[in-house]
Design a protein with these regions (language model features):
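Short, hydrophobic secondary-structure boundary micro-motifs
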Residues: 104-107
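Alpha-helical DNA-contacting segments of helix-turn-helix folds
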Residues: 56-63, 115-119
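Residue-level recognition of alpha-helical structural elements
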Residues: 81, 85, 111, 115, ...
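C-terminal peripheral helix-coil segments that are non-catalytic and often amphipathic
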Residues: 94, 98, 127-132, 147-214
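Amphipathic alpha-helical packing segments from all-alpha helical-bundle domains
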Residues: 68-69, 90-94, 98, 111-137, ...
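Helix-turn-helix
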Residues: 12, 16, 20-54, 58
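Hydrophobic alpha-helical connector segments
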Residues: 58, 71-99, 200
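Solvent-exposed, amphipathic alpha-helical segments
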Residues: 12, 16-23, 66, 70-78, ...
């Protein structure tokens, strides 16, 4: 007689797997470790998921990156229009909070998975948005500054989402992070626009308001 699979056990395995993937990364996580975290035997995990790849696909759906990109683009467009708060900000934040550990994987633990390109794509997407707001292409030095800033953004968000004790703490930490990040980004972009207009290519200084951008 075939064993009946229980939704509660499946959910427990998926929760344990997502936490392991977010904490240690896909490559460093074994099915035995997931089983231990779920409080069951490895053989039981394989009754629900034929492989680690199948388990990953269940907890990080294939459409998750595209959904995240759409919300991110909408949020950045709102910021470009001077709307730091509003529906776009709320929708992206809710997505991060609803999919906390899956977003951690997308932003910082994607190596060896079908979403391996997501961390670099996140940074590249934000850099391209920033470049489009400039009157001329940035110099190589200024573009490298943008990459550094947005890579730090990626890492900070992933850290907050992975380490926060609960949804409300994550929300509070992200709000505090943005209160620091957004003014710094405003200062950085003002300096880069000025450099692009005068064609000097000179690097912004702390006096231009860059100090809080990272």
């Amino acid at each position: 007689m075939a064993q009946v699979l229980k939704p509660a056990v499946r959910a427990r395995i998926e929760t344990a797997a997502l936490r392991c993937f977010a904490d240690r990364g896909y490559g460093r996580t074994s099915m035995a470790e997931i089983a231990a975290a779920a409080g069951t035997a490895p053989a039981n995990v394989y009754r629900y998921f034929a492989s680690k790849e199948a388990l990953f696909a269940a907890v990080v759906p294939a459409d998750l990156p595209a959904r995240h990109d759409r919300l991110l683009d909408t949020r950045v467009a709102a910021l470009a229009e001077g709307r730091a708060h509003g529906p776009a900000a709320a929708e992206l934040l809710d997505f991060w909070l609803d999919q906390r550990l899956a977003v951690v994987v997308l932003l910082d633990r994607a190596e060896g998975t079908p979403v391996a390109g997501c961390p670099d794509a996140f940074v590249r997407r934000l850099v391209e948005h920033a470049e489009r707001s400039l009157p001329a292409p940035p110099s190589a030095v200024h573009r490298e500054v943008l990459v550094l800033v947005f890579d730090n953004t990626r890492r900070a968000l992933a850290h907050i989402l992975r380490t926060a004790e609960d949804r409300e703490q994550a929300r509070a930490m992200i709000a505090a992070f943005w209160s620091y990040q957004l003014p710094g980004l405003d200062g950085l972009m003002a300096a880069l626009r000025a450099a692009a207009r005068d064609g000097s290519g000179s690097s912004p200084t702390a006096a231009d308001g860059v100090g809080g951008a990272t």
